[in-house]
Amino acid sequence: MYAVIATGGKQYRVAQGDVLRVEKLDAEAGATVEFDNVLLVGSGDDVKVGTPNVEGGKVTATVKAHGRGEKVMIIKFRRRKHHRKQMGHRQDFTEVEITGISG
């Protein structure tokens, strides 16, 4: 059984036991979170597509850890002006393990 969930402005295809990184969630490590924004639930040939969400669809997950992604370097440069601006950014994420899919 698999599902497509939306969280943090992105969509993820998940199955039970999957470990994935999502945008930072406000939950402690070890806590259980529920994703109610389920767009699709499938099991073999039986596929339920929501309009926009599947009624009664729910995905539960356990928060494994919080962290920060790799540093992305941003360089802004103006030619012939002796001007260069260099910045870095690290995005916060939450690592979750999918424990159940219903719907």
Swiss-Prot record:
NCBIfam families: L21. Belongs to the bacterial ribosomal protein bL21 family. GO terms for cellular component: cytoplasm; ribonucleoprotein complex; ribosome. Keywords: Ribonucleoprotein, Ribosomal protein, RNA-binding, rRNA-binding. SUPFAM superfamilies: L21p-like (SSF141091). GO terms for molecular function: rRNA binding; structural constituent of ribosome. One of its GO terms (biological process) is translation. The keyword rRNA processing does not apply. This protein binds to 23S rRNA in the presence of protein L20. This is Large ribosomal subunit protein bL21. InterPro entries: bL21-like, bL21-like_sf, Ribosomal_bL21, Ribosomal_bL21_CS. It holds the Pfam family Ribosomal_L21p. The keyword Repeat does not apply. Part of the 50S ribosomal subunit. Contacts protein L20. It comes from the Bacteria.
